[in-house]
Amino acid sequence: MALQIDVPDAPKHGVLICGHGSRNRLAVEEFEGLAVGLKQRLTGFPVDYGFLEFAQPILRDGLENLRAQGVEKVLAIPAMLFAAGHAKNDIPSVLNTYSAETGLKIEYGLSLIHI
């Protein structure tokens, strides 16, 4: 079932799924499948994804894709089981730097352990 939300006169929101990345191609493909599934469910929002390391696209690529679609505010969701160093420090650092450089508003969500 798709979730369709329309909010008139609100900034255009998008969703960025943040992954760690892997050198294992099958792991990367599984993560890409997660992003595709979310795109199908969140039909009212542009959805993209990126990896912190070891795989493409990187987080900045996903953010650029969302900006190119007119997104003004991003909800970045770490798709990690635990809020370890990457989820607590590295991903927020990339997001904060990108936001400071471009002015894009980015809210950072909780790791999957909190759900």
Show the residue positions of the predicted features.
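N-terminal glycine-rich anion-binding loop in soluble enzyme alpha/beta folds
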Residues: 2-62
